[in-house]
Amino acid sequence: MRNHVISFENVVKQFDDEPVLKNVSFEIEEGKFYTLLGPSGCGKTTILRIIAGFNDVTSGDVYFDGKRINDVPANKRQVNTVFQDYALFPHMNVFDNVAFGLKIKKLSKAEIEKKVKEALRLVQLPGYETREISEMSGGQRQRVAIARAIVNEPKVLLLDEPLSALDLKLRTAMQYELRDLQQRLGITFIFVTHDQEEALAMSDEIFVMNKGHIVQSGTPVDIYDEPINHFVADFVGESNIVDGVMLEDNLVSFVGKKFECVDGGMRKNEPVEVVLRPEDLTITTLEKGKLTVTVDTQLFRGVHYEIICFDEQGNEWMVHSTRKAKEGAQVGLSFEPEDIHVMRFNESEEDFDARLESYDE
C-alpha cells in the first residue's frame, strides 16, 4: 500500500475573491522527489505555502499522514522550507544559522553540535561552522539554507525556486547535489520551479500547473513523451505542433498527407493536434523526406544547430541537428511513426491515462 504523506482534496484558494487554486487534488508519496512546474502565477508557490502552513485554504482539505491539518499551525508541521532568497541571518555565522531551529527546541549543546555537523557534512560543507554568511558564495549559501532545513529532520522538505539566483553552471551542479541529497536522506522533496529542464532532470514525479489547475502529472518521461495538450507540449521542451485529423487508429493526417502513428482510441476523422519534437526530425533529401520544407534560419546552440524551416502550407518546423543546413534550400524531413504524438482537444487527464493504457496493453 502506498504511503501518501500529503494529500490535497478539492483545495480552493482565493486572494481578494480572485481564485488562485481551483479544486486542486493530488497525493504525494513518501520518499520521492516531486516538482510543481508552471509559469508565474499558476499557483505552484501557493500550494507550497499551504503545505507549510503559511497560507490557509479557502475551501477543501489538506492531509498529512492521513490527518487533516487545515488548522495545524506552521511550527507544528513536519515540514521545512528553503526559500528563493535563502532567508539566512546575515549577522550569524554558519553554525548559528543551521542551529537556529534546534536552539528554539531547547536541545542540549552537545546534541545541537552533533546535528549541525552532520547536516553540514550532508551538504558538503564540513568545517564551515565559523564562516560568516557574507564570506560565502551563492552556492555555499544555498547549501547552508538546505542544512538549516534538514537539521530539523522534517518528513517533507519544501523548496521554493531555490536555484533561480544561481548562474547556469552552478545551477546544474546543484541539481545533481539536490537529487543526490534527496536519495541519501530518503525524505520527500517538493520543489517549485518554472524551469522545465530542472523539473525533467531531478524529479520522480512532475505536476504541470496552469491557471490554478494541475494540468498533467506523471514521470518526466511520461510528461515529455506523452503531453496531454497544447500547453504541456509547448511548455515542457520544444515542440512542433500542427493541426491534424485522426483518420483511424494508427493513421493520422496533417499538412495534407497521411502518416502512420502509434496513437489510437479516438473517433474516426476527429480533429486533433500533432506533436513532433525537434530532436526527432532528421533533415534528408527531398526523395527520402516525408515532408518538404524550406530552411529559413538557424542558430548554433553548442550541442546542436536549431534550424527553422517552413513547409508549403506555411507551418513552422524547428529541427535540432548536429549538421549545419543551407539557408534557402529545400530539404526533406524524415521521422518515425513512434515520433508522432497525437493530442485530443479538451481531454481530461483521467480519460487520457485510460486511453494510453488501452492501447499499451
Curated annotation (Swiss-Prot):
According to the UniProt entry, its GO molecular function terms are: ABC-type putrescine transporter activity; ATP binding; ATP hydrolysis activity
**Compartment annotation:** Cell membrane
Q: Does the keyword Membrane apply?
A: yes
The protein's matches in SUPFAM superfamilies, at most eight in alphabetical order, are given as: MOP-like, P-loop containing nucleoside triphosphate hydrolases
Domain ABC transporter, by residue range, is 6-236
Q: How does it sit in the membrane?
A: Peripheral membrane protein
Which domain of life does the protein's organism represent? Bacteria
Which catalytic reaction applies to this protein?
A: ATP + H2O + polyamine-[polyamine-binding protein]Side 1 = ADP + phosphate + polyamineSide 2 + [polyamine-binding protein]Side 1
Q: What does this protein do?
A: Part of the ABC transporter complex PotABCD involved in spermidine/putrescine import. Responsible for energy coupling to the transport system.
Oligomer and partners? The complex is composed of two ATP-binding proteins (PotA), two transmembrane proteins (PotB and PotC) and a solute-binding protein (PotD).
The UniProt entry, under PANTHER family, shows:
SPERMIDINE/PUTRESCINE IMPORT ATP-BINDING PROTEIN POTA, SPERMIDINE_PUTRESCINE IMPORT ATP-BINDING PROTEIN POTA
Q: Which family does it belong to?
A: Belongs to the ABC transporter superfamily. Spermidine/putrescine importer (TC 3.A.1.11.1) family.
Protein name listed in UniProt: Spermidine/putrescine import ATP-binding protein PotA
